[in-house]
Amino acid sequence: MSKKEKWIYGILVAGSVLAALKMLFWGYGLDEEYQIIMSYRNIKGDTMFGLMHESHQTSSFLCTFFMWLYRLITGGYTGVVIWLRFCGTLIHLLLSVFVYRVAKKDFKSDNAFLVALIYFNLVPKQMMIPEFANMQMWFFTLTVLCLVKYFLAGEKKRYLTGCGLALSLEVLAYPSMVLQLPFLLAVIWLVAERQKVRACVHVAGTCLASALLYVGYFVLRDGGISGLIATVGRIATWDGAHDGTTGGAKWLIILQNAGVYLLWTAAICVVAFLVNKVILKKEKELLFVSIADCAVLISCGVQLIFWVVLNRGYEYLHLHVAVMLVAGVNYYFCGKREKPERLLLLAGILGTVVSLLGICILTNLNLLVSTAHAGVGMVFAVLLRNSCIVHDEDDNRKKVFALLAVLCLTLIVGKGYTMRQSRDFSNVLESKARLLYGPAAGCITDFDTAQIYNRVYEMWETVDLQDANLLVVSESVNSPMNTWYMFDESSICHYSIINPSFYDERLLTYWKMFPAKAPDVIAVECSEGQPVPGADKWIMKYVTEEFDYTQIVESYFVRLYMR
């Protein structure tokens, strides 16, 4: 390793550490809060597929365990958000070590550490807790790596078992990942040279057994399957946040988004072709590899412009991911390795595309802000780059190192500098305040989020809502107002705390089904002391005409109606 490469390694490691520290302390809201409140409900005793009607509730098991452990040690939830981020970072680090070991031992990569560093800087969203998007990425990684170990380390059955268990956990994290099972079985069938049926049955049987055990628990708990089916039906029909995520209109938008990626990728490839053919005059045998390398570098530059210059926020486009996946397929056809190594890496790339398809099925976001979920495919693509045919091994090693270093630096900037885009908080330099109390104590956010959070907490201390039946009414999508439930460990009286929550006659149905969940206190979001929901909204009519409150506690950002 040259002195220059050592310096580059040092810079990338330092940047990775700083980016990881940033993820511990910056930002708070939306999906992160959603995951935490689901786990809070678990700990409070709200039953899954019973009292809970959140569409992502099967993903809550990791956060629930870590939150339970934290409360056991500290006696409360103050600062639990940063603790969960630390736990998520530790899990991510351990998986990065696994990636390093597989890259070094099984794929004989000279850049195994850099590959692991790339993985460490992958984040589907701007959050590091064990949240469903992160969990999907982690368990998909384990699924693929267990499959790699099975084929490249002696076809030991324990790796097939691990593969099936990891896929089962991935489905819990993101139920639409069930699409991965037929794809995985097809990969096993294509790669295996013997015992194809046995290997497929082993993985499928592990998944089936896991599913039967999981569903069987709820059937035994409820004394039959009818209650579970009814609850799943209500979850599907009551989830207002995802009402618009099905149907032809949604897929038309996704196809339009795919067209945007196609145009960007085509334009970048044309530029890369001109650079290599006209300016560098590359030989025909090396032309396609050089075009792919150049295209990846250009895409990294374009993405950095969107992040740093245009301030678009983390989620937007992720052009480097799309181009790297296309480049990875190109590297496969330019490779020199015999199967199963190359085919397994190609399967990893295509598997991330299947993952992205599964995410598109359930998400209420468009493809332009969802492509980061396919980032794991870049790890398999860079490993395929090592297998490409070259004339000068030393020159190729330098090119691969440079390619991986630029890609890693791009990921570090995305992870460490940007934020999830909002009105005035799209990068760390726009940080203006800190959350001082409660579960998110220590988190650094924009001014409005911090002001509302801190002042509401201070008001909360003037009333006693310990174990009260509380309904929080909020119309703000990005503000973490469901965290109010945790300020005094109140019982949640909404069937689903997905953001945005919906308030209509379904609440009456829920309270009739579960009378113990009828609210004693309703906290209504306010602006300048006035309720944000209009007087014509169903929930405000219910509060003022039917709730029979006996006391009102008012403040600038919230109004409490108390029985």
Predicted regions and their residues:
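Extracytoplasmic catalytic/substrate-binding loops of multi-pass membrane glycan-assembly enzymes
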Residues: 24-40, 44-66, 78
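Short acidic/glycine- and proline-prone juxtamembrane loop motifs at membrane-interface regions
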Residues: 128-137
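Extracytoplasmic
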Residues: 222, 407-563
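Transmembrane-helix signature of polytopic, membrane-embedded enzymes
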Residues: 94-122
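Perimembrane helix-loop-helix junctions
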Residues: 146, 152, 180-216, 273-279
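Short hydrophobic alpha-helices at membrane interfaces in multi-pass membrane enzymes
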Residues: 143-169, 196-205, 343-350
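Membrane-interface alpha helices of multi-pass inner-membrane proteins
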Residues: 124, 146, 158-175, 181-186, ...
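Membrane-interface transmembrane helices that cradle and orient dolichyl/undecaprenyl
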Residues: 105-110, 141-160, 194-195, 328-340
